């Protein structure tokens, strides 16, 4: 076997007959599998030990040679080599076919590769191959055309006409093989290139397609006649096993049935040929052989599939590769692993951020080898076998050893579905009793876990390196920030929020108000002994608190509450004292009004101060973000644990309860509803009198009921008691929102009908009063729709993530700086008046391209190629700068990835991104993970002016990334200039928009009902939308440059996500969009050897042009192509990645003809072949480090190394019938 971590590339080609023979260890001549009595493989059968190797390790079939000492000996009695059984997984056999057979992939695929090579229609090919017609192979002197088709009857007539032997015509795959042998690739290619110079329309398209296939054969060195099989490989028997079930029956792989049919028909054909049977019988047998081979390679591709018992189609070789259950996705891209377990999760409130609780019985099983090694090392027993027995008996001594073994040995916890990289994190195990895994409450948000029965899987990293990586890179305490937006993902929730909210409340007139304490301990003691209430405002000597005070503040008394003193106790020392829940206090310190000079009147000072609101969930989030910014991970995770403990403690002390009496009653609800009823009557009257249309009536009625609900909501908010438990839960952000509250106490309002239209009858009751039967019935529609939507959305969003990951999986940070000379000019994204993403948000964490100067003073704010920090971004925006040129992924020149400067900071860490970071996968997860939060709806723009539906939510995101024609497409102008007129044409129900510019005039026809975006006299740019709606990006690409299209797509994706309140960093969308515009279509090859009309990577295109320009030739011209993510994934340079994504057979067929080489640059390819992935610590620059003793002389003057001298082997993979097998050449 090849050492998998050593080879550089993998090639797939067509297998020549000699190649198949070289793989084979013998011919399979009989259809038998195993003997029903002895259960031993039959001689020359499908499981023959002579061909495929012994069924028992180091033992021949007859038992003459047993034991390892005879390895490599071939038994003289039974002819079986003495070796490992494992060879039965890798040794192949073959079947010598008595008649050539066509390979269905190359004949049936779309486009038919055989058809293009021979310039024959697939229909004609089918007739010839399946013995329905003759094809002329050599017309000799007759007027017949070469490759023309004739029926049996015509053939006989021609023979009579021209005489026997006057021309050659054949049928079957043999005929096609002869024709393929006649193809002169060089000559045909030259002719096609000539033809392309003049051809147009369909002819041109066909010529380009033929040229593509012929050129592929020519360049790869594959012979076209290899598409016809004379010899069929038989895959190793352990890949198509027969298993004995209890009850003496056998379960066998379908492939054995399919091979058996081929062998039976082949043997029968051999016999008929020996007997010189009549031609028609031989023909029929050859046709049946052809069908048997078709079924073996791809059952069901042509005609009805061959079925097994219960009319179930048999699984052929192609099916073994295809789909979710196929070889690629089931066994290569992800496998089941040992040293893993799963269990229900329970909450572990006492754990530290980096810990998880693992049940004892689970841990002993998972860490068994480590425990056994330690038992032997301590001389408790002498060997591993005895140690194993000790562990399995559950000896008392093993538990102490287990405790020691798991110290410092992190484990990974994973919750399905793993939507982003925070779905797998590392923890230090803590042994617990019980059978449930214990999870820290703060990491629940990252996992999206709750404790209503969720299960989680646990994995043990085994090697030292794996443990080190888990500890350094994956420890839960390190994952404070969310990679999608750089905001903290671990914010306290529920009880923790409630406790801190209650703790920091302020109340007037509670016991102990106005007392003054000398230090924290005195204040807390007074509180513990009941002299002062947690919420009372008191004074404390400022200098007793260890905080960054000014000299003046130090000698005063601080007015605060005991609760806030306790709250500030848990904060790091460098942070200001937190008195008000706002950002000013957090960054600049306590406002002056809270300081009282020594000897001042404290009662009066307190009465002059307003009560502060308590700290809510949002404020806690801001505090965490600020602490992370200042102190980084270690301090932040320690603070989070302290905040968690404080929150749980005080929510327990607060003792919040909820009863029916806590739901307030709105006194004037009846009047508000009565008023609305009257208004609705007036609206209906207007409609009856014909003053308004039905649409207007409907809109007015629904608007009226919405207003009524809002009025009730406002009353509720105005009259609420801040100490009401429900209000406290809602206000603190612990649970529930104003909408839930108003359904409990106000009214439920309007409901949606099953068709998505809002019903005019509102639900007037709230949950406290209870609903009537009719109201209850109405509200069930919405509930059901919600459940269905969620289920559908999850599947859709998961599939979107899969496509995104696939298209960007090879985008890795490859170098420090690509040295590009281009940048991206950015400004804030806005839709009309509404701000979608501010300039400050877009600048944070990016590198500048040009110097940014103050627009008024001209002072330099930041130089070129510098990192824009949060503070710098704020400074730029405050200076009034509206647009900045930054380094962007769009303009990065790095091949197969991005450079550090164009990417900016890694949002998950807040530092500059490291070389080796798999930013493509992170981008895909960041866009896909919130997909489930987006809606599934297509909104109807209510009422009058809508003939277009605006797609939003998940369908819109898919529409953008798949580059589809949008629903409700906007009309765009190709001319830059002024709108001169808009004319309405009532007869055709359209409008015409006229645009006049310097380069020419444009006239655009717009639907009558479309809403216009422009007015007469307005200026429009090229590619600007004239009507409301989404622009079709492919049209935009035709009139504008690539960067404009990329910028447009970026803005569109942001609009969808931001409108749903989901924040995603621009750079993630940039990575995805860049992958959609990586290809160029060659329009004119110039002097290069590129083919016209082919799609190729931008980098390869520029390389080809570079060579020609250096030689002084004419470069090729190309046009950038925008592809949807699915198409882009299939067009990737890696055939392994594409084949494992979708359309496996088509990808492999194409790759084999081209003799494609996979250079293993992406992640998937390497996972498939079992090589360490080239990202993170798997990158060559980190892997090829040799530890050596430092020689000072060398250290100061390092020797220059030559490049490209690492030892590698090339691996060539051939596809024959379908087997992908590795051979080293």
Curated annotation (Swiss-Prot):
The keyword Manganese does not apply. SMART domains: RPOLA_N (SM00663). Mg(2+) binds at residues 450, 452, 454. Zn(2+) 2 binds at residues 818, 892, 899, 902. Pfam families: RNA_pol_Rpb1_1, RNA_pol_Rpb1_2, RNA_pol_Rpb1_3, RNA_pol_Rpb1_4, RNA_pol_Rpb1_5. SUPFAM superfamilies: beta and beta-prime subunits of DNA dependent RNA-polymerase. Zn(2+) 1 binds at residues 60, 62, 75, 78. The keyword Phosphoprotein does not apply. It catalyses: RNA(n) + a ribonucleoside 5'-triphosphate = RNA(n+1) + diphosphate. Binds 1 Mg(2+) ion per subunit. CDD domains: RNAP_beta'_C, RNAP_beta'_N. Keywords: DNA-directed RNA polymerase, Magnesium, Metal-binding, Nucleotidyltransferase, Transcription, Transferase, Zinc. Its EC number is 2.7.7.6. GO terms for cellular component: DNA-directed RNA polymerase complex. Its cofactor is Mg(2+); Zn(2+). One of its GO terms (molecular function) is DNA binding. DNA-dependent RNA polymerase catalyzes the transcription of DNA into RNA using the four ribonucleoside triphosphates as substrates. The RNAP catalytic core consists of 2 alpha, 1 beta, 1 beta' and 1 omega subunit. When a sigma factor is associated with the core the holoenzyme is formed, which can initiate transcription. Belongs to the RNA polymerase beta' chain family. This is DNA-directed RNA polymerase subunit beta'. The gene is rpoC.
